[in-house]
UniProtKB/Swiss-Prot annotation:
Binding site for [4Fe-4S] cluster: C337, C397, C400
Gene: leuC
Organism of origin: Oenococcus oeni (strain ATCC BAA-331 / PSU-1)
Protein name in UniProt: 3-isopropylmalate dehydratase large subunit
Keyword annotations of the record: 4Fe-4S, Amino-acid biosynthesis, Branched-chain amino acid biosynthesis, Iron, Iron-sulfur, Leucine biosynthesis, Lyase, Metal-binding
Enzyme class: lyase
Matching NCBIfam families: leuC, PRK05478.1, PRK12466.1
Self-association state and partner proteins as the record states: Heterodimer of LeuC and LeuD.
Single Gene Ontology BP annotation: L-leucine biosynthetic process
Length: 457
């Protein structure tokens, strides 16, 4: 019987349970942050339990951290959560990339960056965008706080095995079109619930030609299409990325030999297959209040089909038939676990080099980790951003979500490289428009979205 990569990894991790029912599976790595872990640790204390495998857990601080004056946390709840994580990890013997640590950053950025994320693993975190790690050929998914506690106590989790979707991505991307446009295009076409109840695997020549950071962008946003998990078969690109990282296997040759078993035998093994050609794909921009409400830059916003569309247009202050180049951009955000990596910053910097953002625009550049910030500064990216009028910040989740000081004011349209454009996501009343780093950089210069393909050419 033909099997998917997902089937093979799942089978190796099942401890007990019948097919079709919840099964107890082993967890290779749990990533922790300050927001969804406090109650989990408190639960352990109340039951007088220890962490089963401290070495299989790793924590960082990202959601609430300020990106200016990082040790001066003014919000009392945020400060308490960060202090609590520091105490909990110390008390239970878990590694922590704390405030100011050279390893600190967004949890879904530092996992791969440190070599913690590896093929064939089951990886969990109390955060929905845990699917990012599936880009390495792993099963990775977000869990709730009670499940975080269960994993801490047992290094296992109860899960019902989902069905699988294979998304065949093929063709050659045009200049100015990126991985972000692919996943936004898929969600815009298939809807925000196409993946509900499924684990997604991306495959095809377009995927094979991507670097790891592009692959992570795809898997990161598959959750916005309803899927709990997204993955990509590991290959030499994967192995080369992991080699020599801090927590990479000591014997890479042996590890690679093991990792090579994780592949899908045939597309026939998937429960469902979606075909997606990128040959004619254009840059995408979101117009509404979910990632599926997005259009190619050269197409008008759609007609109102239902009450959800009507409410979305009212919230963002736009009208059906208008185009993305009519959105008055006053705020831009470069960062997040979707597009806050070094290659993303390089792309944005190329657009901004020797240019200046439009007067009246606030532009935040927030590297996904301290290591990325240091690497960017070594090649002069910080100077390019600052000379263009942007603010160069410390690492963190920042303006992706309104849980820290970096918030978009009410009524303001923000061009953002993040992953969600829900009402109030970037701050109460904020209006978020998702796009690639190149598109956001161009919007910062012009004060509106333009077709970056024409700008580059």
């Amino acid at each position: 019987m033909k099997k998917t990569m997902f089937d093979k990894i799942w089978h190796q991790h099942v401890i007990t349970g019948e097919p079709g029912e919840p099964q107890l599976i082993y967890v290779d790595l749990q990533l922790l942050h300050e927001v969804t872990s406090p109650q989990a640790f408190e639960g352990l204390r109340e039951k007088n339990r220890q962490v089963r495998r401290p070495d299989r857990n790793f924590a960082t601080m990202d959601h609430n951290v300020p990106t200016v004056d990082i040790f001066n946390i003014k919000d009392l709840i945020s400060k308490k959560q960060i202090e609590t994580l520091a105490k909990n990890t110390k008390d239970f013997g878990i590694r922590l990339a704390g405030m100011g640590s050279k390893d600190q950053g967004i949890v879904h950025v530092i996992g791969p960056q440190l070599g913690l994320t590896q093929p064939g693993m089951v990886i969990v975190c109390g955060d929905s965008h845990t699917a990012t790690h599936g880009a390495f050929g792993s099963i990775a998914f977000g869990i709730g706080t009670s499940e975080v506690e269960h994993v801490l106590a047992t290094q296992t989790i109860w899960q019902t095995k989902p069905k699988t979707i294979g998304i065949h991505v093929h063709g050659k991307l045009s200049i100015g079109v990126y991985a972000k446009d692919i996943i936004m295009g898929i969600i815009a076409r298939e809807g925000v619930s196409f993946g509900t109840g499924y684990a997604v695997e991306f495959y095809g020549d377009t995927i094979r030609n991507m670097n790891m950071e592009e692959r992570m962008t795809l898997c990161n946003m598959v959750i916005e299409g309803g899927a709990k998990m997204g993955s990509i078969q590991p290959d030499q690109t994967t192995f080369d990325y992991i080699a020599d990282r801090k927590y990479a296997p000591g014997n890479m040759e042996k590890a690679v030999s093991y990792w090579k078993q994780f592949y899908t035998d045939s597309p026939d093994a998937f429960d469902k297959v979606i075909d997606f050609s990128v040959n004619e794909l254009a840059p995408f921009v979101s117009w509404g209040t979910n990632p599926g409400m997005a259009v190619p830059i050269d197409q008008p916003f759609p007609k109102i089909k239902n009450e959800e569309d009507k409410k979305a247009y009212e919230y963002v202050g736009l009208k059906a038939g208008e185009k993305a180049n009519q959105i008055p951009i006053k705020f831009v955000f470069f960062g997040s676990c979707t597009n806050g990596r070094l290659s993303d910053l390089i792309i944005a910097a190329k657009v901004l080099k020797n240019k200046h953002i439009k007067n009246g625009i606030t532009a935040l550049v927030v590297p996904g980790s301290r290591k990325i910030k240091e690497k960017a500064e070594k090649i002069g990216l910080d100077k390019i951003f600052k000379e263009a009028g942007c603010e160069w910040r410390e690492p963190g989740c920042s303006a992706c979500l309104g849980m820290n000081p970096d918030r978009v004011p009410a009524g303001i349209h923000c061009a953002s490289t993040s992953n969600r454009n829900f009402a109030g996501r970037q701050g109460a009343g904020s209006r978020t428009h998702l796009a690639s780093p190149a598109m956001v950089a161009a919007a910062a210069i012009h004060g509106r979205f333009i077709d970056i393909r024409k700008e580059i050419i």
